[in-house]
């Protein structure tokens, strides 16, 4: 039994070996044919590769031309951008300003604005410094400071005073009404404060909150004052023009009258030119002379002759 079993196993192993050899032979045969097929395929693939390489080279040339055109376009765009840089900077600045204005306008719509009145401005304080001081209480939208009169400025500088600009009064608009009220309550009658060595530390401000007063009312008032001032100026100019015209007319009329008088005096002198000469009495022997004259002359001659003889 044991031997049979061994025989069976040996037969099976042998048969398996034979099958493996046959399979290997078949594979070798197939590999041989597959090489030929691969040669054919390789030949075809080489031809196709040569054909396929041509469009790739054409694509490369086209891509190079497109790259050159793109580089030229980029250079022209850079040149145009270099020319248009200042314009773009101005546009950018303007757009920032517009955005700030729009933001403040939106905040105004959300909140009710408040206006404070500054009856006294510290000497030589500029609007930027005033805005900085008031901004501690809230965001400020608009600020207006009225300059001193030109006559006062000239008088002050003529007397040896400081030539810097001074402001007399001002108005400030807060975006929030409560900030304006807080500013008026805090700063009115108090020192400005801040750093102890600052120029405006000990200056006192007079700040008053204007209830129910808007910036439009201030602009209307200023426009009204400007209109009144302009009307007065135009009236004064028209009056001065009338006076000048009247004066010129009077001067011309006086010159004309003087010329007329001179001409008349000259004509009168020419007409009244009568000359008087001292003449001796003349005796005549004319026929139409009276006989007394004729006899008188004869008697005078006789008298002369008698005196001589």
Swiss-Prot record:
Residues 114-204 form the RRM domain. It is found in: Nucleus, Nucleolus. InterPro entries: ABT1/Esf2 (IPR039119), ABT1/ESF2_RRM (IPR034353), Nucleotide-bd_a/b_plait_sf (IPR012677), RBD_domain_sf (IPR035979). Residues 88-98, 265-275 have a biased composition (Basic and acidic residues). Keywords: Nucleus, Ribosome biogenesis, RNA-binding, rRNA processing. It comes from the Eukaryota. The keyword RNA-binding applies. Residues 9-19, 38-51 have a biased composition (Acidic residues). GO terms for cellular component: nucleolus; small-subunit processome. GO terms for biological process: endonucleolytic cleavage in 5'-ETS of tricistronic rRNA transcript (SSU-rRNA, 5.8S rRNA, LSU-rRNA); endonucleolytic cleavage in ITS1 to separate SSU-rRNA from 5.8S rRNA and LSU-rRNA from tricistronic rRNA transcript (SSU-rRNA, 5.8S rRNA, LSU-rRNA); endonucleolytic cleavage to generate mature 5'-end of SSU-rRNA from (SSU-rRNA, 5.8S rRNA, LSU-rRNA); small-subunit processome assembly. The keyword Amino-acid biosynthesis does not apply. Residues 1-98, 257-309 are annotated as: Disordered. GO terms for molecular function: ATPase activator activity; RNA binding. Residues 68-80 have a biased composition (Polar residues). CDD domains: RRM_ABT1_like. Involved in the small subunit (SSU) processome assembly and function, and in the 18S rRNA synthesis. Required for the early cleavages at sites A0, A1 and A2. Belongs to the ESF2/ABP1 family. This is Pre-rRNA-processing protein ESF2.
